[in-house]
Every structure is written in C-alpha cells, then in structure tokens.
Amino acid sequence: MRTADIAKRYLDYFAKHDHLIVPSASLISPNPTTLFTIAGMVPFIPYLMGEQTPPKRRMASNQKCVRTLDIDEVGKTTRHGTFFQMLGNFSFGDYFKEEAIHYAWELLTTSQDEGGYGFDPEKLWMTTFTDDDEARSMWINEGVDPEHIQKMGMEDNFWTTGGPGPGGPCSEIYVDRGPAFGKEGGPIADENRYIEIWDLVFENYEVDNVKSKTDLHIVGELENKNIDTGAGLERLAYLLQGKNNIYETDEVFPVIEAAEQLSGLKYGENEDADVRFRVVADHVRSALMIMSDGVRPSNVGRGYVLRRLLRRTVRSMRMLGVTDPVLPTLFPTSKAAMEASYPELNDTFHEVSESAYGEEDAFRRTLETGTTILDVAVNKAKSDSAEPVVAGEDAFKLHDTYGFPIELTLEMAAEQGVKVDEAKFRELMAEQKSRARADALKKRHNVDLSVYDDFKKTLVSPIDFLGYTDMSARAKVIGIMQEGKGSVPAVTGPANVEVILDRTPFYAEAGGQLADQGEILSDDGAVLEVDDVQKPIKDLIVHQCRLTEGTLVVGAEVNANIDLARRGAIARSHTATHMVHKALREELGPQATQRGSEDAPNRLRFDFQWSKAPAKSVISAVEERVNDKLRDNLAVTTKEMKFDDAIALGAMHLFGEKYGDIVRVVSIGEDGWSRELCGGTHVDHVGKIGMVNILSEASIGSGVRRVDAVVGQGAYDFNAREHALVSQLSDKLNARPDELAERVNALLAKLKESDRRLASMYESQLAASVPALVADTKNSAAPVKVAVKNVGHFGAVDALRKTVLDVRAQLGEDAPVVVALAGVNEDDKPMVAVATNEAARKAGIKAGDLVRGAAKVLGGGGGGKPDFAQGGGVDASKIDEALEALKHEAQKA
C-alpha cells in the first residue's frame, strides 16, 4: 500500500464518520515563536484552546511537519527524520474517549479489503495513564488483551500545551515487530521492538503553572472536552509495506536509489555510507517540501534551516564520492516520489528546483574555498597541541568572511579528530551582533527600547495617523525623549530630540517606504526640523528632530507640516514599485514574489524571489509594460477590508509579514490590474508618476534578485544625462549615436589584440631566461639548489606557473631543488611562485611555507601545497628583498 493510499484510507474513514477533512496547513508556522509546523495539532490550537470556533466539531487532516531539533542525529539512526506527516482526528467538545478509542481500534484492525489497515490485533499494544482506568476498560471492551495494556506516568502519558490551557491523559498505540527487533515485555521493555504508531490525547482538564511534564497544577475539568490524536504516517507506511524503517518506504527510498546511482555505492553494505545515504534522503525531501511552501535559502530563520538542509545534502554526497552537482538528480526524484500525496508540487517545481540548484552551485564554491582554509586551521591545531582545537577566531573568519557555517566547521573538524573552540566563536558572534544592534539603534537615538515600552503604557488613546488625507495638522506634544535621558518634560535648543504627538500627518518608515520629513512649529516659538520618523515599537510614532530654536515642552500645541515635495516623490516611487512587482509577475510567473523594497524620492529598489538572472528582454518588457500603464493613467484606490476577503480578491502580500484582521488594499486600475496589501502612501492616478527607467537587475543572494529604477524626475534626469553622455561619446569617437556600439567593439578588439601581443612578448622573454637560470643553478655547490629570479613583467599568471614547473623539471631530482620566480602581473601587482622537487620536500622544505614568507615581505599573502604554491602582494619594489629572504630560508634546511 502506497503512503499516499495509507493517508487517503485514514481520511476516508473519518470522513465516513462525519469529520470535516481539511488540507494540510503550510509548513510555515503561524506562531512567531516557531519556524515550522512541528505537529499535526498545531493548526488546530485555536480550537483546542477555545480561542476560535471551529468550522465543524469533528475534523481530520494529514499535516506536513518539520522538526530540525535533532538534525545532527538524522541518518545515525533509522528513527530520526526532519520531515514527517501526521494523520490526526480531532473533536472539539463533541465525541470523547470511548469513540476515539473505538475509531482507532476499528481502523487499525479492520481488514484492508474492508477499508482498514489490517493489523493483527495480537500485535497491538496500548499504554494508558496510570490513573486512567477508564481508558483501560474501554480498550478491553474493544477486544484488546489486558496483558497488552501497560500503565505509564505523567512523563509519558499526560499531555499539555507546555503552558496554561487544556491538558489530559493520553493513550498510545504500539505495534510489536517481533523478537528479531528486541526483547519481549511490551513498550515499557523495548521501544525499538514495540513501535508507537498513534497517540490519543483526551483533553478533559484545565491546567496551569506548568513547570515540567510532571510538575503542573490541574485547575479542574473542562466544560468542553477535546480529542487530539496523531498517527505517524511514515511509521504506518513502513509497517504496512513490510519494511524495516521509514527510509525504506516508497516516498523516501527512491532518493537513496538515485544517490546509489550517482555514487556507485550500495546502500546496506557500509554503515558510514548508509548514514550519508539516509541524510541525503531525508534532507532532500524536507528541502523540497519547505521550498514548495515558499521558503528560500537565506542566512536567517527558516531560510537558514533550509540552507543547512541543502548544504548537508551536498556535503553528504561528497563524502559518498560525488563532486558533481547532485540536486538536479535528487530533487526530481523526490518530487516524483511525493507527488502522489502532493500533486501541487508540480506547480512550483521549476522555480523551486532552479533555486535549489543555484544554492548548490554557490555552496560548492564555498566548500572548495572553506575546506582549504579549514584544513590549514586543522593542521595548525594539530601541530600546536596533543589535543588539537581549531581556534574560535579561525571558525569565525570561516563563517564571517567565507560563508562557511559553524555547524559544517564542527562536523568537518570532528571527522579529523579535532575540536573547535565554539565558546570563542560564540563570543565573537555575540560581539558582532552587539555592534550591529548598536548601529541599528543609533537610528532611533536610543539604546533601550524599554523607554518606549514604558512611555506607551502611559498613553490614554492610540496615536492618530492622519497622513493619508492631511499633509499638515494641529497636534499636541505628548512626549519628548533625549538620548541618555529617556523621557523628559522639556528641551531647549539647539538639541536633537525625539517628539511624540497625539496625532500626526508624518508617515513613519515602514513596508519599504522611507519616512516623511518636514517641520514641527510650536505655538510657543519652538522650531523643529523633522529628519526621520520611526516606529521603534508597535503603534508608537516617533519624530526624530533637530530643535533649532526655542524651548519645547510636553503639552505644547504645535503645527506639524510634512515636506510636500518629498512626500509626492516617495508616493510616485511607491506606486511605481507596485507596478514593477505586477509586471515582473506577468513576465516571470507568480513565483516572482516580493522579498523587500525601498521607496525613496525619485527612485525605487525592488527585491524579488527568483533563482537566476532573467533575460534582458524580460526586464525591458517589464519597463515597457509599466510605462504603458502610466500612459493609460490608471486610477489608484485604497480600501480597508477583512484579510480573508483581500486574499480572495487576489491581493498580494509580503511573505512572512503578519497582518491584522482588517487590512488596507491598494488597487491600480478599475479592474484591479494590481492589488496589494499596503499601508503606504500613493498617487491617485499613475500618470502622475511620469516615467520609470530600470537601471539594473542583479543577484543580492541565493534565490533573490534586485531591480533598481529611477522614477519621475529621477527618470527624466537620468535620460538627460544619458543623452549628454551619448553626445560626448559621439563627438570623441566621431560617430553617430547609432554607430557607437560598432565603433566601441572595434576599439575593444584592437585593445585585446594589443594585450595578446604584449603577453606573448612577456612570455617569450620569460622563456628566454630559463636556460641561463637552469645552468647557473646546476653549477651551484650548495646542498639545496635554489633557483630565484626577478623576471619583471611576465603577463598572465599561468605563464609564471608553467615556467617555474619547467625549471624544476629541468633541474631533476639529484639534489633538493627550490625554484622561485617573482615579477609583476597584468595588473602591475607583484607575485611569486615556488616549486620544490621531491628531494627538497623530504628535507622538510615546503613551497607553501616559502611563499607565505615571501608574500609577507611584499605586503600580501599566499599559500598552496608542499610541491607548488603562489602568492602576491602590493609592493613591487620589494621583489628582490622577498626573493632573497626566500632563498635564505630555503638554504637553512
């Protein structure tokens, strides 16, 4: 029975028993404290807690889940996995214990021909809570052997949310896999032989003061009792398919088979390799499912977890001997295995897979660089101590400079028997974060958000934002703050202050839109220039000002006036951003979703999700589409409505942003050509924007692209500068504008030919110097024959390398030989290349060590292998000094 069919059979059974079948919720958790949906009951928590009314009192689902807490254990055992599916049936104040037990028993033991799973009743075992004799009796009434029912305490068989709320005893169902898997005695004796497949939670208590699973206070019985159950689909699948573990099921094992083909190895022949196979199978599936729900690789939150899954996959395949790209094989394999359960995977697979492949390419480059640097750090640690530890500074440099994750550093170091000073690494990371926080807080002129929290608690009513309709307003000063002093009653200028008004037309920076600027004038004569407006905490609008004249006091009546020209320019940019977003989606598809933006006077920046560079024709089409709509002068309207109604209309919203029940929808065009949830300011007709020119499109990270554009006056100014530049070039090159490209290409071709001839001349000069150098070195009576030469300009780096290796070959192996050539490359930077023969290496002379010393003299660095290394610097005047130092060091051996 396929996994998809096992799930369908479960849902069909409960649909027959009047349950509303709901689709799986997204893997992206609605709870801000968790990254992913980690349990089948998570989407139902509002109903279980009594916070919302369920659409029906009986419901069932197959919920996608991801848990990465034990990610390091994945593969080491066959029980751990990051992605899993949880079947569940729920009752919210409807049926209770007896029906839940009956449903579970009936579905498990009814024959497969009659719609059940066909488990042998003699192989089923139950656990109940110590005091729950009622559940025990109900199981016996269903036909369970009393000897197959075991009691467990609160640690195992009492469930709570982890805090105040519903709770109650649970009963777990196990399958006996037989004596080949462990000893007799039921789940209490051996949970490897007896595998848990289903947990029935009977929520009949209200609990609080939950300190641990065994330390809590039962307040009393719930008025409405709930049923919350969870059956692990993967466990059911491997038992019903006659397999030994989750990795051998139909939705997982195909990835292992694909990895076998890529590596040429066989699963089941070597435990170390098997661990890697299992890591790959699990992580590929998890990554595919996470990405299909909209997550993309990044350095924070869910994106970081995803990035780690993909990178562990690539690294595990490397440890299986595969250095070529692997995801183009593994991702389609996993999709094919999963699409019977999730046909929607096909809708986004092209964009998802391109993003994953791009992440693999980037990581392969990181891995090559980082591995070399880590090897140096590991070797250094081994040479310094009998109990080697990689310095925390080295681990931090790998992470900060080369993007090498600490988890990978720890893993790779451990494989070589070396520890990492993780405490020092964490200390350096904390220092870096502290610096970043301090920089961010400078913008708020305060370093302690509690000042704002304390002030907000004193507000009698919310601050009224008037800026959608009013450009100036009468207001009252209700708060004044100064850096280092917090809230103050009055300030005399000149001074930098933060001012809070009871009502304001000033827009605070949010949603990518920059803040308004302007002035605040008090009736008492105080003059304030408003430079910025921020919301340091929710619903608190803070004006960051320069008090240039007078004294400002709390309670003062003021006129607040925004800079109309700036507001208009920003509004034009913001509306243009919506239009660019819409046009991009028209050209690229619905996967091109917003990841960020900045709306500034006369310019915009728009970040969107896309895995590779769009064709230039696509960007041109986007620009043309936007300007066509500008000429149509579409109307821009705003309307507040319920969030669900807005989404039903097709309104776009920011990924990961939290919205209230009532949202503001900005629509462009009577037919809603563009609709977005947005709290920003906009023009009333797009014709007022004037023009949009897209200046550039580029990658800013894995799977994220950025468009920069100029808007309105910015676009007109740009076109004027472009016209002037074209005119200047036409005059200088004596060509019409339409001839410029051809003329420039001809000049570049001439320059390239000149460079080629120059490089050829340098190489000829370099080659001509070899015979004399070889002859002089052979005649040397020194125990170590050292050939050094300042070759001057040598052209391409490869020419220097080839010459060094050629000289080494001609000098042979009769004695230790070191060849060191230095000169100036195409960029006029000094470089040195060193080669050693086998006799020199046996004498302890390493090319890498010699290069590092010479490059240091040149003001740079370098390294390489014992037989060949190269490096460079910045001070070409010290080439002779560097070679002399190198020669002296080589002859010391």
UniProtKB/Swiss-Prot annotation:
> Where does the source fall among the domains of life?
Bacteria
Could you give one GO CC term from the UniProt record?
cytosol
Q: Which residues form a coiled coil?
A: none
Q: Which UniProt keywords apply?
A: Aminoacyl-tRNA synthetase, ATP-binding, Cytoplasm, Ligase, Metal-binding, Nucleotide-binding, Protein biosynthesis, RNA-binding, tRNA-binding, Zinc
UniProt record similarity statement: Belongs to the class-II aminoacyl-tRNA synthetase family.
Name used for this protein in its record = Alanine--tRNA ligase
Could you mention a single GO BP entry for this protein?
alanyl-tRNA aminoacylation
One Pfam family name is tRNA-synt_2c
Organism lineage reads as: Bacteria, Bacillati, Actinomycetota, Actinomycetes, Bifidobacteriales
Q: What does this protein do?
A: Catalyzes the attachment of alanine to tRNA(Ala) in a two-step reaction: alanine is first activated by ATP to form Ala-AMP and then transferred to the acceptor end of tRNA(Ala). Also edits incorrectly charged Ser-tRNA(Ala) and Gly-tRNA(Ala) via its editing domain.
